[in-house]
Amino acid sequence: LLEIDRPADPYLEVASVARATDGGPAVLFRNVTGHPGRTILTNVFGSRARIARMCGVHADYLPRFLADAAHAPVASVEVQDAPSQRHAIVKDIDIARTVPLTQQTKADAGYVITGGLVIAKDPETGAFNGSYHRMRVLSKDTTCMTIQAGRHLLEIARKYKKAGKNRVPVTVNVGAGPAVLLATSGSTQQTLTPMGYDELGFAGALQGEPVTIAPALTQPGAWSLAEAELVLEGYIDMAQLASEEDSGQDGVKGMMPEAGGYMGRAWKVWTFTVTAITHREGYTYWFPLAINAETTNLMGLPAEASVYDACRRISPRVFDTCQVLQGMRGCLGMVIRINRKSFRDEGLQNNLAFGALSAHSDMGWVIAVDHDIDIGNADDVMWAVISRGDMKDGLMLSPLAKVSGMLSEGSAAGLGRKVYIDATAPFAERERYTRGVFEAVDLADWLGAEAAAGVRERQSDYVKSLLARRY
């Protein structure tokens, strides 16, 4: 944890420091301009290795950990004395006065809540759904809420609409625990957590105990996370549209830097009206930067778990694991690693790729690699593509299918072609692709501890990855 005591302005400064520390330590701002006594936390999930330590598993097998938990949900339990409701504001609500809202760049549309977990209860099944949606603050008690096509929250809203109701009671929870964040950060439709699946049960399985919830103070039918830092109670108003940026244009101007790496477009979306703000004593405001690894890690892990679950059903003998590279931006692509045992396993990498592409609707690219590849290292994956890929027989372009709009192929309707690259060596010719194995040495014995440390500091992550492996 990196603690910063100098004053930090939520306008541009906090986001700029968060961006500059991307992939590094978690950062706690202790002196937030305009909000005495308030703290802001970011980059908690910026490191995959750190997430793996939280879960007590090897980083390569985080997908298995999540997939197993999804099949053994632990139901949430209701409590009456929730820490997240220790302080409640139900009159004279002013979001900007209570919450240290951030603006990331000068080109942004305004101040945006990026870490608000929307908890909604399905009015038909009673299952809890959790999802993140960017929320530009419009007034003292109103924000936009951007809900992409295909999101389960949109389907829940449609159920309310079908019942003749224009308002969807929800809570927006900031600063939920790691298990809740991992269970609810899937970006869109994925087979592991289909519509009607209770995602708080998933979170309970991840943390080994039920998630605690409390009835909202001002919204019947809504529940707050009892352990959240901050909660905005309110309702989504389906009868009220508002533009995310002041000109009122739809899909023309930039909104803020998004997970795909570009400025996200501003749209006309539903509004969210805040009817109460509750929070812990001395709460900390969690601020994930959408473009940072913190967000793409949280988006990517549920996608990995969904692909892992699908692929192990297709061929548990050959499939090893899977991972989203940082450049794949959370859920736009996946690397799957296989280990064929005999000539009869040849071709299963292709079946696994088809399963991976179907397990998550946003998935646009899949690359299959052999068991000797470090799937977390983009250089090693690219080496496999270059040295083992056969672009005549090992490249597939699908017909038009559902993909993310963040892909270059993706249209406004979410249509595009999916891409698969077989970057595995032919099993029958595997001896041609044997890597050299050198003897292990302790550089400190040869160079001294200080010089050895200097060498390691200069080596790239790719070289460190290669030297750490014994084929």
Regions from the PLM with identified roles:
Residues 1-271, 275-471:
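Extended, highly charged
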